[in-house]
């Protein structure tokens, strides 16, 4: 069956006023459409055709004769369907019986107790437990069932289980309206070590970070705000792409603009390339600050040339990347840099709604001996107030005190303002999102539920991308491209592999190299892979011990090779696996029906003689009468005398029954076949 539209079986059954089970039987017996369960999706054309046929039947005076067939033996199998259609035509006269057969739609969260499910199903608890026992699940009345178990159980009672989000969470934090008021930009400074990131931050702040911290006057809260010609800019003063990517890996996009610092006398260096790749992966606008222009060896043109090698074309070279020559030492160019930040922010049209409840991200967090859990927050929308109840990741609390970046005690903080707060129950993680909720009880309940979900997730397998599971994820629409990080021992290998991998891209599967560099596989690489759901490929290099531990923790797939072509073959094989498989039919054999047996508890058994090939238990079969295929299905049982048989060869007799088909006649030919997948040999 081709899935072209989202018409589910249970939805169509409701429209036709019949149960899902009856519709599934009708689809199989009358339309030759096989579906797995009530949640299966029907082709739009099939659904419309079925509706038209049902409408025609109800409007026809000959409806009663439609299901009449020549043989009395299949009357019983069709009687239920006919009776149901007659009841529909009569307008459901027997309302009491119909109400028990009506399909029930049940909403549940991740788990539900046996008693709660029984109440929703309107069935005795003992009956539900009995069905669970038939399913091989031994459960007490107060035991919790997961979603999959509850779904299968509900199907037996003609009910549909729908998963829902927590109502409280939905009501409290679902509002994603960005608002209409302008907000300050949030800026992160990135670049290679010793290129002057901290010096630029210090120069902008008009004071040395070390001197102010030593006196305990200024609180280091991980961010600060400056005023530029009446406009505010918030800088995250934890420079480096590690913090930037760690937050992004947690789903927190806090940065609006990135300042990429490049030393004029040093040029593009390995960590600069990493920073560039992080920015591209996060799709954050970038301003290049070419620092140390006061040095004698400064060469602006060389830096710009190296930028173009990474597809960053400066504006004065005809591109769209803003480059600003600066000197943190002499303060030259810093005003221009700040103006460019304001200009870029205006182009980005950064908006917020100060009137809504606050939400944002944790920048830093620690446990203070005297003050307890302390968290630095960046308010991204709304206004945060002292006394607000908040949910922060898996923890919660009520804000007892709030301080700005200068250590001043404040009562309120608007969008893009960094603050330090007291009052949380535990220390959150950097990158955790926070939301203000109506009261502390709500926050505590939400935190408890999040912790429970986290425990469940830890028990489940990881969902990071590996070459083995890419095909399944692409089929489910989870992965639309394969992101790769390449590390090698020499630059020539890196470039060769990147070019080769990018050439593998097709219309069906895209390969995107998000980072390539020389050196061992580091924790930074693993963090980027976790944030971008990427695979790491290494050539003649190994991951460090810390990187190995982190990769295992984050579920990042790391592959190392000695030969480049082995890696290309593996990537290509994974991509080939993503292509839609093709199938060919292989006929296994055929058998002639010599005698037909009717068994009330089983159905129709065909006594057959295998004419050629073989009949196997797991094969599909088609029933052929007078050269015409009248039905296709699976073998429900295959016996040789009284014993179950896996297969029966040519020249032997057997007994078999066909799934959902009882109209077998003497002289019919049973043809067994399988569908074999033809694996694509190339892209």
Swiss-Prot record:
Any GO CC annotation of this UniProt entry: cytosol
GO molecular function, one term: GTP binding
Chain segments carrying region G3: 237-240
Disulfide bonds listed in the record: none
Subcellular locations according to the entry: Cytoplasm
Stretches for region G4: 291-294
UniProt xrefs under InterPro entries: EF-G-like_DII, EFTu-like_2, IF2_II, IF2_N, P-loop_NTPase, Small_GTP-bd, T_Tr_GTP-bd_dom, TF_IF2_bacterial-like
Chain positions covered by the region annotation G5: 327-329
Protein name (record): Translation initiation factor IF-2
Species: Clostridium novyi (strain NT)
């Amino acid at each position: 069956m081709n899935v072209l539209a989202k018409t589910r079986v249970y939805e169509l059954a409701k429209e036709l006023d019949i149960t899902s089970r009856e519709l599934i039987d009708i689809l199989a017996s009358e339309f030759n459409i096989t579906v797995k369960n009530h949640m299966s999706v029907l082709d739009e054309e099939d659904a419309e055709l079925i509706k038209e046929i049902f409408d025609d039947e109800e409007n026809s005076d000959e409806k009663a004769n439609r299901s009449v067939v020549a043989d009395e033996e299949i009357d019983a199998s069709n009687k239920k369907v006919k009776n149901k259609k007659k009841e529909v035509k009569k307008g459901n006269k027997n309302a009491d019986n119909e109400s028990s057969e009506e399909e029930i739609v049940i909403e549940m969260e991740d788990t539900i107790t046996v008693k709660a499910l029984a109440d929703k199903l309107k069935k005795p608890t003992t009956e539900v437990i009995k069905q669970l026992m038939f399913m091989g699940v031994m459960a007490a009345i107060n035991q919790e069932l997961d979603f999959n178990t509850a779904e299968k159980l509900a199907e037996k009672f003609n009910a549909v289980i729908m998963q829902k989000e927590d109502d409280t969470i939905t009501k409290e934090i679902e509002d994603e309206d960005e608002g209409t008021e302008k907000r300050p930009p949030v800026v992160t400074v990135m670049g290679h070590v010793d290129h002057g990131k901290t010096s630029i931050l210090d120069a902008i702040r008009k004071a040395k970070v070390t001197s102010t911290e030593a006196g305990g006057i200024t609180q280091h809260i991980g961010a600060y705000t400056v005023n530029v010609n009446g406009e505010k800019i918030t800088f995250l003063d934890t420079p480096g792409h590690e913090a930037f990517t760690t937050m992004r890996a947690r789903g927190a996009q806090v940065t609006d603009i990135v300042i990429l610092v490049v030393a004029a006398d040093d040029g593009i260096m390995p960590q600069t390339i990493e920073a560039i790749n992080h920015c591209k992966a996060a799709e954050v606008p970038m301003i290049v600050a070419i620092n140390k222009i006061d040095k004698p060896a400064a060469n602006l043109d060389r830096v710009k040339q190296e930028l173009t090698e990474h597809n960053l074309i400066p504006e004065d070279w005809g591109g769209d990347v803003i480059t600003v020559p600066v000197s943190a030492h002499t303060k030259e160019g810093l005003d221009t840099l700040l103006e460019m930040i304001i200009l870029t922010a205006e182009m980005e049209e950064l908006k917020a709604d100060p009137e809504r409840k606050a939400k944002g991200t944790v920048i830093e967090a620690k446990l203070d001996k005297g003050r307890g859990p302390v968290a630095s927050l960046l308010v991204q929308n709304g206004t945060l107030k002292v006394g607000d109840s908040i949910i922060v990741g898996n923890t919660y609390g009520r804000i007892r005190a709030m301080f700005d970046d200068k250590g001043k005690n404040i009562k309120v903080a608007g969008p893009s303002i960094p603050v330090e707060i007291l009052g949380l129950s535990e220390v959150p993680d950097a990158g955790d999102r926070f939301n203000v909720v109506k009261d502390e009880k709500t926050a505590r309940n939400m935190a408890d539920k999040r912790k429970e979900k986290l425990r469940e997730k830890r028990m489940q397998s990881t969902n990071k991308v590996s070459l083995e599971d890419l095909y399944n994820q692409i089929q489910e629409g989870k992965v639309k491209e394969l992101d790769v990080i390449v590390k090698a021992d020499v630059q020539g290998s890196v470039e060769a592999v990147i070019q080769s991998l990018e050439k593998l891209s097709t219309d069906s599967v895209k390969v995107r190299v998000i980072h390539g560099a020389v050196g061992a596989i580091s924790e930074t690489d693993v963090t980027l892979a976790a944030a971008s759901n990427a695979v790491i490929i290494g050539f003649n290099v190994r991951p460090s011990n810390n990187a190995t531990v982190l990769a295992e923790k984050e579920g990042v797939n790391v592959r190392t090779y000695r030969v480049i072509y082995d890696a290309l073959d593996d990537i290509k094989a994974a991509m080939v696996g993503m292509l839609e498989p093709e199938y060919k039919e292989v006929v296994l054999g055929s058998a002639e029906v010599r005698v037909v047996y009717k068994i009330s508890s089983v159905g129709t058994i065909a006594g057959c003689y295998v004419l050629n090939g073989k009949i196997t238990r797991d094969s599909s079969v088609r029933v052929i009468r007078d050269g015409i295929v009248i039905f296709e299905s699976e073998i429900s049982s295959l016996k040789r005398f009284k014993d179950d048989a896996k297969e029966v060869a040519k020249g032997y007799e057997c007994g078999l029954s066909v799934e959902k088909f009882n109209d077998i006649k003497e002289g019919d030919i049973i043809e067994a076949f399988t569908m074999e997948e033809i694996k694509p040999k190339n892209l």
